[in-house]
Amino acid sequence: MSAREKPSSGLVGAGLLIVDKDAGVTSHDVVARCRKLLGTRKVGHAGTLDPMATGVLVLGVERATKLLGFLALTTKAYTATIRLGQATTTDDAEGEVVASADASGVTDEEIAAQVHTLTGDIQQIPSSVSAIKVDGRRAHALIRAGEEFELAPRSVTVSRFEVVARRTEGAFVDVDVEVECSSGTYVRALARDLGIALIGVGGHLTSLRRTRVGPFTLEHARTLEQLAEEPGVSLDIDAAAQTAFPHRQVDADEAESISQGRWLEPIGIKGVYAAIDPSGHTIALLQERGRRASSVMVVRPATLR
């Protein structure tokens, strides 16, 4: 951190915080706790995790909250346990049981075959208890109000869906899986659909842990308890931008120019990328359109340099 960066600049303490979320708390609970621990209201999160789920949750702190809208968190990875033979209202363990069936006779080969059909580019109906909007209202709110509705299938990509262990629990079968998928994929819906395909009764998740979001993994993450012992971001704003985006080196004159909102000559990089000055600081996020590489976010405007 440069000595020129004053506390009032919003750059001191700015960066991404990667939290290993505990079960039983909401993503908003995590944000509220981090605001207290870091002593700032400027904390936001990218994406959410269900209360039952644990694992990687990406937060922005101070000026880095503006990075969140540009992060390409389009791929995610999970470990999960699916219970076959029992369907719930939420497709996870937090819901009420609505149907049961004996799954003990399901073979490993049958499970593998149906897992295969749920892998690749698929059409998935999201879980009904979700944040998806139906006529302007959240699906989970409609469920609580007792209203009936149907969610349309969505195109999602499940690049990996692998069974790593199986256990028989009486009439139920618990299957440990690893999933890599596109943003918008509901692992709860995979559990539901696997159960329906195998025994006619939707399965549900008994555990879910997110191990990766985009380039951010559990290796970057800290629990709230660890954060309380040593408050601070996981990646400062420079490391965050350079981890999350492709980058381009710029000279001092170019850095000064884009810090004042001017554009540079394009060099053929697709999508949003970071412009890095000779000292290693991220000056701006740029995007090329036609004959210009223009800023979509100035990380270090001239007034803060």
UniProtKB/Swiss-Prot annotation:
Catalytic activity: uridine(55) in tRNA = pseudouridine(55) in tRNA
UniProt superkingdom: Bacteria
Enzyme active site: D50 (nucleophile)
Keyword match Lipoprotein: no
Entry GO MF terms: RNA binding; tRNA pseudouridine(55) synthase activity
Keywords per UniProt: Isomerase, tRNA processing
GO biological process, one term: tRNA pseudouridine synthesis
InterPro entries from the UniProt entry: PsdUridine_synth_cat_dom_sf, PsdUridine_synth_N, PUA-like_sf, PUA_sf, tRNA_psdUridine_synth_fam2_C, tRNA_psdUridine_synth_TruB, TruB_C
EC number of this enzyme: 5.4.99.25
A Pfam match: TruB_N
Protein role: Responsible for synthesis of pseudouridine from uracil-55 in the psi GC loop of transfer RNAs.
Record family assignment: Belongs to the pseudouridine synthase TruB family. Type 1 subfamily.
Protein name, per record: tRNA pseudouridine synthase B
Organism ancestry: Bacteria, Bacillati, Actinomycetota, Actinomycetes, Mycobacteriales
Gene of this entry: truB
